[in-house]
Amino acid sequence: RIKAWEKVGDLTIIPGDYVNYEYVLNWFVENSKIYDIVKINYDKAKALRLNKELENAGFETNEIRQGFLSLGGPMQNFKEMLLDGKVIFNNSKLYRWYLSNVKLVMDRNSNWMPSKQSKSRKIDGFAASLNSHAEVLNMLVNPVGTGKVTYYSISDLMNM
């Protein structure tokens, strides 16, 4: 399965027993020549060095806190957009595999958080999408009007 994902370009296999962040940094540098990368969101837990390298290379980065409160709203909206067919992932088999590994956990306030179905199941690609969506969500709302709200009291209304 992994070789098939690599063959279609969904996955890059790098040498070694761990992720050498130089490969990730180089991937962003190369792709920034093709795409306008506005900001790179990251999970602080495992990306401290990579984040510094990205900043040194001139990228703007943003930490996305991994919690029910910070990801609950984006998770709900992402799920709705996915069900409405508004999330475009080119029917990638790797991404579908990530989605099949996601288990939604809910806190007592009905905030959702993605979790793995089991330890051997990976959700990294989905988690990266959700981290991006947490930031992009504000860009999806089109402003209406001037944003100014006028307050009228009962007295004001009676005198109009």
What are these regions (language model features)?
Residues 1-66, 72, 76, 89-160:
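RNase H-like, metal-dependent nuclease domains and their acidic two-metal-ion catalytic environment used
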Residues 75-84:
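Short, surface-exposed amphipathic charged segments that create phosphate/polyanion-binding patches used
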